[in-house]
Amino acid sequence: MCMICSTFNPFLEACDYDGLNAPLGDAQGDGPQFALGNTLVEVTDAAASTATTYAMAVNDFFMGNLSSNSDRDWVAVDLVAGQQYTFAVAGTGALFDSNDDPFLTLRDASGGLIDTDDDGGPGRYSSLTFTATVSGTYYLDVSSYNASDSGTYGLSVVEGNRASFNSEMAAGTLLRPDQAWTAVVGEGGETVSWAIRASGNTPDGQTFVPLSAAQVAATQSIMAYVDAISGLSFSQVNPSGTSNSATILFGAYSNNDGAGAYAYFPGSTPGGSRGFTALQGDVWLNNTSVSQNNLSFGTYSYYTILHEIGHAMGLAHPGDYNAGLGVSITYANSAQYMQDTHQYTVMSYFDETNSGVSGGLGYPDTFMLHDYLALHTLYGAAPTYHSGDTVYGFNATYGGTVYDFTANTTPLMSVYDGAGIDTIDLSGYNMAQYLSLEEGVMSDIGGYFGNFSIAYGAVIENAIGGNGNDTIDGNDAANTILGGSGNDVILGGGGSDTIDGGDDDDEIYGGSEGDLLFGGNGADTLVGEMGNDTIYGGNDADLILGGNGNDSLFGEQGNDVLRGGRGDDFLDGGNRNDRLYGAEGDDTLLGGNGDDLLRGGAQNDLMLGGDGNDVLIGGAGFDTLDGGAGDDIMVGAFNADTFVFADDHGNDIIEDFEAANDFERIDFSNLSTLNSLADVLGSGSGTAAATQVGLDVVIDTGSGTITLLNVNYADLDAADFVF
C-alpha cells in the first residue's frame, strides 16, 4: 500500500494499494487463529536478576513499566529444547508514558547473555526469534536502548517466527511521537479544517486532477465518520464546492507511479496560524488505482480513502514496509507480528485471511479494533457518537449504511458506540453465528469467521440471534439477549441479564449476577450460576440449574429437571413429570402437575408434591413434606420432619416415619376428617382410623390412606400428630 517518498519526509505516507488490489481470495489463505494467553501486569518493580518474581508462559503478555531510564525488568519463561520461539517488546501506545525505544535481551537460566535485539520489530520496537537449546527457565530482560527512555511496554512470547501483539502493543505500533493534531495528546477538543482541493499540483509535480463527485461523496462520508468517533473535530470549508484554504486538502492525480494514494501525517509543533506546515494532513488519490465512480463501502477505493485519512489523523503502518514500483511485500515475509492484518487495522497491507478470517469479505468497512484504540489514545473518545439506542445489523437504526446487514452483506468491521442501550441484531441470518458483546473480541458474523468486533470503550448491551445454532457471549452490562431459532449457546457474563433462548434446544448461562432466563421451546439447559436468578424452562424437557444465590426455577411444560444449588431456592416443576433437587439452603420445592420426584437436600426444606403420584425425599434438615393429591411416597431422610396431609390426598406412603422421635410429626391440621388423637388412635368405644397391617400402620383418612412403613401402632402417641 504505502511507500515513503524518495526524498524522505517524516510526515508523508505514500500508499501503493496495487499489491492488494487483486481478486479476493488471492491472499495467503485462511490462516489459523493465534492463541492468546494471560495478561500479567507488573505491580511492584521486577528485579533485574534471576531473583525476579515475575514469570510468563508461552502466549502470555506481560505489561510492564520502566520507571526510569536505567530501569531493567527481568521476566522468567520456561522453554522446550528444539522449539522455536519469538519474543517481542513494544510500547503500549500511551504516548506520554510509553517506552518508545525498548531493548530486549535474552538470558539463560543463570542470567548469562544469549542474544539481544534493538529495533527488530516494527519501528523502534524489538523482537527476537530463538530456538531453545535446552529445556528450562530463560529470562527476558527489558530495558531502553542506551538507557535513554522510560515508560510502559508490552512483552510477548509465542512459538514460531512471528511475534504476537496484544491491543495495547499493536496500538503503539500505529502511533508516532508528536504526530497529532492536538497539543495535549488524549484530550482532543481541537477543530481542524479540511476541504476538497480547488487547484495545485502534487508536491512532486504531478498534474492536479479534481476529485470526482463520487470521490467527494466518499471523502465527505468518511470525514463525517472520523469527526464523530473521536474527540477531534473536523470542519469542511465550502462543503458544496472546493477550496485551498484549509489545513487538510484532498486532491487527485493520475500516474502509474506505484502509489495508489498518499497522505501526510499531522505536524509535531505549533507554528503559524494553525501551527502546521502546508502539506501536513493532505491526501492525494491516484486515479489509476482509485475509482472515480464506485466507492461504496467494502470496495478497494473506499478503503483506500479510509486508510489515507488514517494517516492524516496520525496513524502509521503497523510494520516496517513501504511499497512502490517493483517492490513485492507479502504477509509471510513482511508482517512483523501476527495481528498485522485488516482484521485488526485498516493501516495494514495484509488481507484479513492471514490472521484467520474467512475470505471473500472485501475490504474493511470501518476503522478496526486497533485503529479505534490508537485514535482514542490520540484524541480521546466521542461519547456522543451513536448516543441513542442504536440497532446494528438487521432492522438497523442507520439503514443503508455499513451498519445495516441487509445492505452490507459482507461485513468486515469494528463497532464503536458512545452511549445508549444498543443492540446487535443478527435475526436475518440462517447460519450459525458467534457473537461476543465483549469489547476487543472477534466475532463470526454472516457466515464469515473473525470479521466483527466491538471497539474498546464501547458498550453494546443487547443481542438478537439468528435462525442457526448461535453462540452469544454477553458482557458486564445488563444484557438482553434473544437467541431466536436454532440450538443456541448463550452466556450472560456480568450484569443482571435477561436471556430468552427462543426455539430449539438451547444452553443458557446467566453469569455472575441475578439474571432472568427463559428457555422457550425445545429441550433447554439453563444455568443461573451466580446471583439470585429467576429461570423459566418453557416447553419441552429442560434442565434448570440455579447455581449459587437464592434462585427461583420454573420448569413450566415438559419433563424437567430442576436443581437449586446453593442458596434458599424456589423450584416449581410445572406440568408433566419433573425432578426437583433442592441441594443446599432452605428450599421450597413444588412438583406441580405430573408424577414428580422432589429431593430436598441439606437444610430445612418445604416440599409440595402437587397433583400426580409424587416421590418426596427430604434429606438432612427439618423438612416439611406435603404430597398433595395423588398417591405419593414420602421419605424424611434424617432429622425430624413434618408430613402434611389435606383432604383428597390420595393413598400415600411414609417410608421412614420414626414414632419414637417426638420431633417428627404428621400434620392433619388441613384435614377435615381427623381432628383429634382419638380420631386417629381411637378411645373407648370409638373407632380408630389407624390400624396395624403386618409390619406397617395404615391410617384411613376418609379421602385416602397413609401407610407408615415399619411402624408399630403401639408406638404412636400425641407427640406424633398435629391437629
Model-assigned labels for residue ranges:
Residues 3-7, 14-73, 111-126, 148-150, ...:
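Acidic Ser/Thr-enriched surface turn/capping motif at secondary-structure junctions
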